Each structure stands twice: as structure tokens, then as C-alpha cells.
From Swiss-Prot:
Subunit structure: F-type ATPases have 2 components, F(1) - the catalytic core - and F(0) - the membrane proton channel. F(1) has five subunits: alpha(3), beta(3), gamma(1), delta(1), epsilon(1). CF(0) has four main subunits: a(1), b(1), b'(1) and c(10-14). The alpha and beta chains form an alternating ring which encloses part of the gamma chain. F(1) is attached to F(0) by a central stalk formed by the gamma and epsilon chains, while a peripheral stalk is formed by the delta, b and b' chains.
Protein name, entry field: ATP synthase subunit delta, chloroplastic
Endpoints of the signal sequence: none
Highest taxon in the source lineage: Eukaryota
Keywords: ATP synthesis, CF(1), Chloroplast, Hydrogen ion transport, Ion transport, Membrane, Plastid, Thylakoid, Transport
Length: 186
């Protein structure tokens, strides 16, 4: 089993527990916003990610940093959950747990996540049109687009919804032609 699968297996019960707590306390939307904020902070700060994952740092130090960083910005239930992760030495997996939580929360809300990689930024009209097409394609009530610009696609875009990938990029087309011609393309 790959290390990624192990992380997912460990993250799942924590994500489920947080979702159950949020549903019980009727704060699912607030906790989801908190988790998204935390993910954004982690994405912007490699130092924080490394600090939280460092087994040599004390539990108290990690709790102090979490409280100083997000303590006044998040719901008390979310903060308590983070403290439990620190106590159980799982705070280093926070990013994976957060991703799993959001995936479960979005499933509960019938929200589909679509990861879009484009060669250039999309206009608001293009985003709206793409959202509507994906709603029809997936029969979802709501679609959330996570858009990233990757100039190396040359042109076009890729869409990933769950395990399904739609590649309309020029890079993808070149790879497909190269495979038909038995040529290696990087």
C-alpha cells in the first residue's frame, strides 16, 4: 500500500468524526469555512506545515502556534478538533484530513468539486458556462470550480471530477498523437 493510501485511511475517520460533530452542533457550514481557511493558510505557509509535522516540537508549542494563527478566526468546535489532532500526534496530516472533510461535506451537500487546469485565466462568463455544463454532466445540484492556471498546457484545459479526467489541452493532444506514433513526449 502506498504512503498516500495510508494517509487517506488515517485521515478518513478524523474527517468523519469532525463532520459528525459539525452536523450534531449544526455548524457544518461554519466548520467547512474554517477548514477551507486552514487549508489556505497551510498552502501559503510551508514553515507552518513543516512546524506542525515536526515530531520534535512539543504538543504545547504546536497548540500555542495554532491558537496564535487561527484561534480567534475559527469556531470553537474546529479549534477543539485541532487540539485533539495535536494531542493524538495527527496534526501533521491536517491537510489530508481537511481535504477528506471537505470532500465528505460537499458530498453531503450534493456539491461536486471540479479541478480545472487552464492555459490562461477564465473569464467569469466562461466559469459560469463551465459550471453549468458540469452540472448537466454530473447531475449535481451545485458545482465548485477550483481553477489553476498552467501555461505548460499550451492551450485548452483539463477537468478532473473525482477520478474522471477530461483533457482538452494541446499538451494532451500532443501526447495522444505521440503515443500513436510511439514517440516519447515530456
Amino acid at each position: 500500500m502506498s504512503s498516500n493510501n495510508v494517509v487517506i485511511k488515517i485521515a478518513q475517520p478524523y474527517a468523519v468524526a469532525l463532520l459528525d460533530l459539525a452536523k450534531t452542533k449544526k455548524v457544518t457550514e461554519k466548520v467547512s469555512q474554517d477548514i477551507q481557511s486552514i487549508q489556505n493558510i497551510l498552502a501559503q505557509s510551508d514553515k507552518l506545515k513543516i512546524f506542525l509535522a515536526n515530531p520534535l516540537k512539543t504538543v504545547e508549542a504546536k497548540k500555542e502556534v495554532i491558537i496564535a494563527t487561527v484561534g480567534d478566526q475559527i469556531n470553537e468546535n474546529t479549534l477543539s478538533f485541532l487540539m485533539i489532532l495535536v494531542d493524538r500526534k495527527r496534526i501533521g496530516m491536517l491537510d489530508a484530513i481537511a481535504s477528506k472533510y471537505l470532500e465528505l461535506a460537499y458530498q453531503m451537500e450534493s456539491l461536486t468539486i471540479a479541478n480545472i487546469n487552464t492555459s490562461i485565466a477564465l473569464s467569469p462568463d466562461q466559469e459560469t458556462l463551465l459550471t453549468e455544463k458540469i452540472k448537466v454532466m454530473t447531475k449535481a445540484k451545485e458545482v465548485k470550480l477550483i481553477i489553476s492556471v498552467e501555461p505548460e498546457l499550451i492551450g485548452g484545459f483539463t477537468i478532473q471530477i473525482g477520478s474522471k479526467v477530461i483533457d482538452t489541452s494541446i499538451r494532451g493532444q500532443l501526447r495522444q498523437m505521440a503515443s500513436h506514433l510511439d514517440v516519447v513526449v515530456t
